Curated annotation (Swiss-Prot):
This is Termination factor NPH-I homolog. The lineage of its organism: Viruses, Varidnaviria, Bamfordvirae, Nucleocytoviricota, Pokkesviricetes. The keyword Transcription applies. It comes from African swine fever virus (isolate Tick/South Africa/Pretoriuskop Pr4/1996) (ASFV). One of its GO terms (cellular component) is virion component. Belongs to the DEAD box helicase family. DEAH subfamily.
């Protein structure tokens, strides 16, 4: 069976196909079949196996030929997108050259996931190293954040022709494309290369599409379709598909028609939700700035306002270029209110940065007296909350020097010890075992051709550590292994982990009980991504039921009330930058969430999973959309809702085939006929325009009914 996605029959054909695949999955789960397909059925979750089969099956055709070139794998964070993509890469590597594009910090994640997958595929084998090396040689890695990404792609495969392209954290690519002011950026060059590539298959992995703006959908689905499926200009996209008055999607039915067949979604199913820990309601701590902090904050706001006024009007008459968000031309010069946002976290009169001195060094040289509630009410509030946590704690800040490093100094002053992996153990075999020995913890690291290194960690000391974008991958891996050790269930080895945006990407953490987000961001998906580092499938399985919860906190700096009311009326800013970012994020989140709901409705598994609002059309074999989006908006919607019902009908045999019919006065010629569709395993109506319709009428009227 070959399905073409621009066809009203595609949704029902896909639903029927996935039902067959699911039955096959259940059979293979219990079988002793040693074929590769059977091994994958036993290694993968059912929702992964559905996509694995649909994408790799040459007869069905997802991501092939007229069925577009790939899929947006929109699976809830922590559900195994990496394992799914590696499964497809292994199965298709004899046809396509797998190229994996991801931030450099995540490359080791793929290697770890590959080893995990190999162990699942070949549980009867004890030594998986040879198979790992054999399969690893087929893959080529490219760093999404590298300055020479284009050169890396050429080195990896010469071009993207004939490649299976896997892009992890794909939302970063989409945002990079629409934030580009020209075609010289890495993201824009990759977009152009993908659009020009021949015989390419694509997997975009993300748990948060449309995180910044619905316009992110444009580069995503243009690349997946291999043509200009959605309008390139921001204004035209918004005119066609966004109702600015209601802050909601416009012409949603027409947009759904264009997207069907390019999305896989998994995340709402009740049986899957049971595998996650419970996320408790967000606690928002509105923390009043100290007088000195608020004074410095107001000075920073004066500078930012002056910069804003100096540049105002420079871009007002410039319409956004193709694939550009409005204002992307000047975004690189914007401060994003960095000064005031950092001061909202920490402000000290003692902090001075000398010439040629790094900010982080200046923070380290500050005396203990600089780290008080007066300099950072936010951090002091956070530390009080952390002391209530019965298990490991994750802290996130976008800011490293005046965010995470300041928190680290506060923790050291409170008696916490910083654990730095490379100072703990020399590099070894990447295998870490932890053993309890009385009141101490012994960490052992086995070198391949050398001695075993051991460090005794006192269980009386509470430790923290940091993962930022500057940390080496081997350090990052070691920290993750220590955190996920069975002996760290309640934070005995690492109680607190501090992460930045780059550092948090791809982390797969267990046992976490609290998440602290030190400052709000206008992109609420960022907060979801941070929480998803510890809210994952199976992450809390080792804990008793009452401990399978995660409490998130968000800290918002508000004005010092006494000083605020002393400012002349009319000169005050009614809301702090923290408050404005939070409110803007909620407003933008409403629109982005509505578009993400559309993606779920267009997902190929939607009807199979029994979700509501799925795109399901009467299978008339008509085109779902016109290639010209403006003309498409003017045409009637060819997708007529599919209604399944039992009806009383008479049987008729004609030319060796069975049909059913009803006498219906409301129909022009007085009859409604039905024929069996083996693809969807149901009877569908024969339209009066079908030549068979007249023949059946004559057959009935001739009195030859069965």
């Amino acid at each position: 069976m070959s399905c073409v996605h621009n066809n009203t029959s595609f949704p029902v054909q896909t639903e029927a196909y996935l039902k067959e695949v699911f039955e096959k999955y259940k059979e293979l789960q219990e079988s002793k079949d040693t074929s590769l397909t059977a091994r994958f059925a036993r290694a993968l979750k059912y929702y992964q196996f559905l996509i694995y089969t649909a994408f790799s099956d040459p007869k069905f055709g997802i991501g092939q030929g007229e069925n577009t070139r790939g899929l947006l794998i929109y699976h809830q964070m922590g559900m195994g997108k990496t394992i799914l993509s590696l499964s497809l890469a292994i199965s298709l590597s004899h046809i396509y050259n797998p190229i994996l594009i991801a931030p450099k910090s995540l490359h080791s994640n793929f290697q770890q996931s590959l080893l995990k997958l190999i162990k699942l595929l070949y549980p009867e084998t004890t030594d998986h190293s040879k198979e790992l090396q054999k399969i690893s040689r087929r893959f080529r890695f490219v760093s999404l954040d590298a300055y020479n990404m284009g050169q890396q792609i050429i080195k990896a495969g010469g071009s993207l022709n004939g490649c299976l392209l896997i892009v992890d954290e794909a939302h970063n690519l989409f945002r990079g494309i629409i934030n580009s002011a020209n075609d010289k950026t890495n993201a824009r060059q990759l977009y152009n290369n993908i659009m020009q590539a021949k015989n390419i298959r694509i997997l975009f992995l993300t748990g948060t599409p449309c995180s910044k703006d619905p316009f992110e959908m444009v580069p995503c689905f243009n690349m997946l379709s291999g043509r200009i499926l959605l309008p390139l200009h921001y204004e035209r996209f918004y005119t066609a598909y966004v109702n600015k008055t209601t802050n909601s999607p416009l012409n949603a039915d027409k947009l759904l028609n264009r997207l069907v067949g390019m999305i896989s979604y998994a995340g709402n199913q009740n049986e899957l939700n049971k595998l996650f820990p419970t996320e408790l309601p967000l606690i928002i701590e509105k923390v009043e700035m100290s007088p000195e902090q608020y004074r410095q904050y107001l000075l920073a706001r004066d500078v930012e306002n002056a910069e804003k006024h100096a540049s105002s009007g420079m871009y007002e008459k410039i319409n956004a270029a193709a694939l550009c968000l409005p204002g992307s031309e000047q975004e690189s010069g914007s401060s994003y209110y960095v000064r005031s946002r950092m001061i909202s976290i920490f402000a000290s009169e003692m902090l001075t940065v000398k010439e040629d001195e790094k900010l982080s060094e200046a923070v380290q040289q500050l005396p203990k007296e600089a780290f008080t509630e007066n300099s950072s009410p936010k951090i002091v509030c956070m530390l009080k909350n952390i002391k209530t946590s019965p298990g490991p704690v994750l802290i996130y800040s976008q800011f490293v020097e005046l965010g995470l490093h300041v928190v680290a100094r506060f923790l050291e002053i409170e008696g916490y010890q910083c654990l730095q992996p490379l100072k703990v153990l020399e590099e070894g075999h990447n295998t870490i075992l932890l053993h309890k020995d009385g009141k101490d913890l012994m960490v052992k690291n086995f070198a391949e051709d050398g001695p075993t290194h051991t460090l005794v960690l006192s269980s009386k000391i509470t430790r923290f550590t940091l993962i930022t974008g500057k940390i080496l991958s081997k350090e990052r891996d070691m920290i993750q292994q220590l955190w996920n050790s069975p002996l760290n269930i309640h934070g005995e080895v690492i109680k607190i982990l501090l992460v930045s945006k780059t550092g948090a990407e791809g982390l797969d953490l267990k046992y976490g009980r609290q998440v602290h987000i030190l400052e709000p961001y206008w992109d609420k998906a960022r907060e979801d991504q941070v929480k998803a580092r510890i809210i994952r499938i199976g992450s809390h399985d080792a804990l008793p039921p009452e401990e399978k919860t995660v409490q998130p906190f968000l800290y918002i700096a508000v004005a010092n009330q006494k000083m605020f009311y002393s400012i002349p009326e009319g000169s005050q800013e009614q809301k702090t930058i923290d408050e404005r970012f939070h409110e803007r994020g909620l407003e933008k989140s409403h629109l982005n969430s509505a578009f993400r709901d559309l993606l779920k409705r267009a997902a190929i598994e939607c009807a199979f999973n029994g979700e509501s609002g799925c795109l399901m059309c009467q299978p008339t074999n008509a085109l779902l959309f016109h290639e010209n989006f403006e003309r498409d908006l003017r045409l009637p919607n060819p997708c007529q809702p599919l209604v399944k019902a039992e009806v009383k009908a008479y049987s008729i045999s004609y030319e060796g085939k069975q049909f059913f019919y009803q006498k219906n006065k409301d129909v022009g010629l007085g009859y409604t006929f039905y024929e069996y569709n083996p693809i969807i395993k149901a009877y569908i109506e024969i339209k009066p325009s079908n030549p068979l319709y007249i023949k059946l009428i004559k057959h009935v009227q001739a009195g030859t009914t069965a």
